[in-house]
């Protein structure tokens, strides 16, 4: 009922004034690819201005600067941004299998477990979900973060560094994990399964959330996004081909990495808030944030996801 009333308000805005524009931040092969493949952007009562980013860090910077209204971002980089004062809130969560976030090594590497990372060079993006899984892998092995050499690089440069031996390991995420394994260019040393909650958020700026018309548009956008994701999983072969063309990966790899994620948009629940608090406390313990962050105020739980999208 609340969502319907918000859409009525949005419709009134669209007829009374010039069309509202939502500025949405995305990463290549992310939300836009699903929405377009599923034809879920038909009859929009607002316009979307897309901004594509190569990784979470610059996307978070755009949210912080107010250059976009909303964007999709992993739990770790969102937390990193929030701890640095970004005026944003999570409005929904995309729950997924975290196994594809992993620490990779070369096929011929002498490293056989997380315990072998001591004293090694690990490439990843600072504050990224890859950084998070690397830290969790070290914790599991009883290794201090100070006992490894961090090499902070973007995905493209990190891959090159692993392939040419400049680093010993690469902590990354999908689709890179599946690509490296499928092409025999890398193998998983430590998987994120059992280490990470597997949460990715749709986050919006405070200014967008405080605007009732943009908030209504965001609710509509979320409904379409959840439906598009479900369509993508019901049409894996078709979507895998489309996704492969967008991210310039073979269709087989694009399909496999998406299927492995098992993602599902859900409304924000207490469990998700608790998981994010655990992540925040972990970041504090590892010196990535300076003061303890109470994450509860960083969630806006007014948004709903269709019941059909949530597994009972």
Please tell me what each predicted stretch does:
Residues 2-9:
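Bacterial N-terminal signal peptides
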Residues 12-16:
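Sec/Tat signal peptide C-region and signal peptidase I cleavage site
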Residues 17-144, 149-152, 168-174, 187-196:
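Short, glycine-/small- and polar/acidic-enriched structural segments
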Residues 29, 54-57, 72, 124, ...:
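Soluble non-cytosolic domains of exported or imported proteins
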Residues 211-290:
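Secondary-structure end/capping motifs
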Residues 281-312:
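Conserved C-terminal helix/tail region of periplasmic/extracytoplasmic solute-binding proteins
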């Amino acid at each position: 009922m609340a969502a319907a009333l918000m859409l009525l308000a949005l419709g009134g805005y669209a007829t009374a004034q010039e069309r509202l524009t939502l500025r949405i931040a995305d990463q290549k092969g992310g939300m836009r690819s699903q929405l377009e493949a599923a034809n879920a952007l038909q009859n929009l009562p607002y316009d979307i201005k897309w901004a594509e980013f190569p990784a979470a860090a610059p996307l978070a910077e755009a949210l912080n600067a107010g250059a976009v209204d909303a964007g999709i971002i992993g739990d770790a980089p969102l937390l990193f941004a929030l701890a640095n004062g970004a005026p944003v809130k999570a409005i929904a969560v995309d729950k997924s299998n975290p196994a594809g976030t992993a620490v990779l090594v070369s096929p011929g590497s002498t490293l056989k477990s997380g315990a072998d990372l001591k004293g090694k060079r690990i490439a990843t993006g600072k504050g990224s979900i890859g950084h998070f899984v690397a830290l969790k892998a070290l914790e599991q092995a009883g290794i201090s973060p100070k006992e490894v050499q961090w090499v902070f690089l973007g995905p493209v440069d990190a891959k090159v560094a692993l392939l040419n031996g400049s680093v010993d390991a690469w902590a990354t995420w999908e689709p890179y994990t599946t690509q490296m394994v499928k092409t025999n260019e890398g193998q998983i040393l430590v998987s994120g399964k059992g280490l990470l909650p597997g949460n990715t958020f749709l986050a919006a700026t405070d200014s967008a959330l405080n605007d009732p018309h943009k908030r209504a548009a965001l609710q509509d956008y979320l409904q379409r996004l959840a439906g598009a994701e479900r369509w993508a999983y019901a049409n894996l072969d078709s979507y895998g081909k489309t996704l492969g063309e967008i991210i310039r990966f073979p269709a087989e790899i694009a399909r496999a990495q998406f299927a492995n994620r098992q993602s599902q948009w859900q409304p924000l629940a207490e469990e998700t808030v608790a998981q994010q608090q655990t992540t925040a406390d972990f970041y504090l313990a590892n010196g990535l944030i300076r003061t303890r962050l109470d994450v509860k105020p960083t969630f806006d739980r007014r948004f709903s996801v269709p019941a059909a999208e949530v597994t009972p």
